[in-house]
């Protein structure tokens, strides 16, 4: 893959992620939806940038991830890939396949995965589901498209489950999740996201898989962690889930900066002579 960049750096690949798991080196994953954020994340050393269907929530303001379309996802992915290419080109870029872009049939899933890979230089696609998508994962990986799986809380199934509660807390559900993880691995997935499941279960899944597990609300035993960039930066004052650690409070900082700008414009304090031609 030709990635023009300013500072050449070893690009993270699926093989590299497997090596990281084998060596016990944790994998860092964050979401991005635009050029500027992707540049910063790549520069800061994030291993994997996920172009998440969470863009439906944090970028477009929808209540769920369901409304976002494949063309909208491709739009975001193109911007993210350009951002990575503008920096070190190190980060792997993975794009979520949106709701109903892969559920109808393996043929349609393959066609849409191919469309995603052809229209921008991302590295892989991500799909939610266990045994129900295993055949589709195999079909897609067989033609050379890397697939990341996603188990536990699956936001695209929110109307089926009715809430964002922790998943797989009961014995049979936990057993099924472990079985699903193994099926996804056997189908050819190179990694799997485990979202909002008990830490002990995530630890067991991680131990039994040879592919990396990426946790979100799944404890510290996973091979890596993923969070939504808006959440760690504190861009939503009202959203404070237990599994998110905030590293900044940008909502308040941006609010203060904008208010100062408005005041300076209203008072005539901006622009100053030094800011004029």
UniProtKB/Swiss-Prot annotation:
The active site is at residue 195. One of its GO terms (biological process) is pantothenate biosynthetic process. CDD domains: KPHMT-like. The keyword Transcription does not apply. It catalyses: 3-methyl-2-oxobutanoate + (6R)-5,10-methylene-5,6,7,8-tetrahydrofolate + H2O = 2-dehydropantoate + (6S)-5,6,7,8-tetrahydrofolate. SUPFAM superfamilies: Phosphoenolpyruvate/pyruvate domain. 3-methyl-2-oxobutanoate binds at residues 53-54, 96, 126. It is found in: Cytoplasm. Keywords: Cytoplasm, Magnesium, Metal-binding, Pantothenate biosynthesis, Transferase. GO terms for cellular component: cytoplasm. Its EC number is 2.1.2.11. Belongs to the PanB family. NCBIfam families: panB, PRK00311.1. Catalyzes the reversible reaction in which hydroxymethyl group from 5,10-methylenetetrahydrofolate is transferred onto alpha-ketoisovalerate to form ketopantoate. Homodecamer; pentamer of dimers. This is 3-methyl-2-oxobutanoate hydroxymethyltransferase. It comes from Chlorobium limicola (strain DSM 245 / NBRC 103803 / 6330). The lineage of its organism: Bacteria, Pseudomonadati, Chlorobiota, Chlorobiia, Chlorobiales. The gene is panB.
